[in-house]
């Protein structure tokens, strides 16, 4: 975001399924829990919910057996904030889903999102006073200058949903407000999609995938 020239040169089109430009309005209880409890600081590894393929192969028979309701509820709770299974047909897709979900991320990425949520602004990673001086030459993490997005001209497709607890629609709309030429941004507003429904839901075949393909072909 701080280097629009680089973005324009290297990105032809941008697609974001479940757009998360910031988490100012994200209601997910896990974000609030991690912020309050500092539990992420206790995790000794660098990955967060990144499971080896072998573990997924163990989950598949377990989560497609009589215990599947428990697995489905846990996954739904993680990605929708409720026990509702959303638009996913777990009976049909469970075997595929549990090989790949949860997909995981780096622990530092999770900490960064919590920092952004707490600061209520888009900023670089906060290493702490001493390390910030080494990385940035200042004691606090630099804030991304969203005014530089004014001339953004990369054709973009962003999906938002009222049921996505990570990608709050208002956060996306606030971000797009920084862009002068809003015609380059296509916003696909959906109903009752949680954060993994964009990819796994049966209805995505009709409501999302064709629009993505058409956007790429334009």
Give residue ranges: language-model regions.
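Alpha/beta-hydrolase-fold enzymes
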Residues: 1-136
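Hydrophobic/aromatic beta-strand patches that form the interior of the parallel beta-sheet core
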Residues: 15, 157-159, 186-188
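Conserved beta-strand elements of beta-rich interaction domains across eukaryotes
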Residues: 20-22, 117, 163-164, 192-195
């Amino acid at each position: 975001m701080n280097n629009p020239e680089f973005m324009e040169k290297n990105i032809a089109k941008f697609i974001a399924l479940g757009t998360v430009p910031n988490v100012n309005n994200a209601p997910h209880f896990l974000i609030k829990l991690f912020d309050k409890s500092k539990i992420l600081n206790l995790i000794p590894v660098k990955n967060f919910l990144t499971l080896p393929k072998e573990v997924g192969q163990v989950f598949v028979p377990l989560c497609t057996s009589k215990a599947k309701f428990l697995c489905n509820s846990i996954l739904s709770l993680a990605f929708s904030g409720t026990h509702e299974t959303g638009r996913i047909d777990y009976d049909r897709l469970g075997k595929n889903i549990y090989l790949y979900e949860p997909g995981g991320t780096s622990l530092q990425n999770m900490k960064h999102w919590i920092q952004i949520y707490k600061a209520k602004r888009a900023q670089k990673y906060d290493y702490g006073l001493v390390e910030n001086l080494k990385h940035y030459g200042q004691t606090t993490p630099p804030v991304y200058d969203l005014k530089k997005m004014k001339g953004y001209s990369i054709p973009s497709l962003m999906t938002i949903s009222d049921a996505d607890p990570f990608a709050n629609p208002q956060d996306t709309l606030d971000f797009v407000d920084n862009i002068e030429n809003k015609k380059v941004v296509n916003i696909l507003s959906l109903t009752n999609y949680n954060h993994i429904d964009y990819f796994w839901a049966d209805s995505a075949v009709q409501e999302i995938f064709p629009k993505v393909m058409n956007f790429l072909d334009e």
